């Protein structure tokens, strides 16, 4: 899978909710919740959505959110209130109406 995302992959159709908490929202312009369009006629993996978030919504340092093709350690990911480890992580197939929550556990001080 290449690093470029096809604009048609995540466009039109249904939506998913993406939420950031624990400071992760600062990487996305301070906005905690985003409604992301999802083309319900195509299979879209969470990995593709991560690239889409990086390319379209991320305003901070990408290295603080992503490491290679996944979320960096220290950021918990919940898919519909379930740990993404139980859902297939980046291979999870997004469904219309999904709620994806990113919680940063990294705190400065």
From Swiss-Prot:
* UniProt keyword list: Cytoplasm, Isopeptide bond, tRNA processing, Ubl conjugation pathway
Q: Name one GO biological process term.
A: protein urmylation
How this protein is processed and modified after translation, per its record?
A: C-terminal thiocarboxylation occurs in 2 steps, it is first acyl-adenylated (-COAMP) via the hesA/moeB/thiF part of the MOCS3 homolog, then thiocarboxylated (-COSH) via the rhodanese domain of the MOCS3 homolog.
SUPFAM superfamilies per the UniProt record, alphabetical: MoaD/ThiS
1-thioglycine PTM sites in chain numbering: 109
The record's InterPro entries line, in alphabetical order, gives: Beta-grasp_dom_sf, Mopterin_synth/thiamin_S_b, Urm1
Q: Name one Pfam family in it.
A: Urm1
- Metabolic or biological pathway, per its Swiss-Prot or TrEMBL entry: tRNA modification; 5-methoxycarbonylmethyl-2-thiouridine-tRNA biosynthesis
What Gene3D superfamilies does the entry give? Answer: 3.10.20.30
The Gene Ontology CC terms held by the record are: cytosol; nucleus
List, alphabetically, the PANTHER family matched: RURM1 PROTEIN
Q: What does this protein do?
A: Acts as a sulfur carrier required for 2-thiolation of mcm(5)S(2)U at tRNA wobble positions of cytosolic tRNA(Lys), tRNA(Glu) and tRNA(Gln). Serves as sulfur donor in tRNA 2-thiolation reaction by being thiocarboxylated (-COSH) at its C-terminus by MOCS3. The sulfur is then transferred to tRNA to form 2-thiolation of mcm(5)S(2)U. Also acts as a ubiquitin-like protein (UBL) that is covalently conjugated via an isopeptide bond to lysine residues of target proteins.
Q: What is the designated name of this protein?
A: Ubiquitin-related modifier 1 homolog
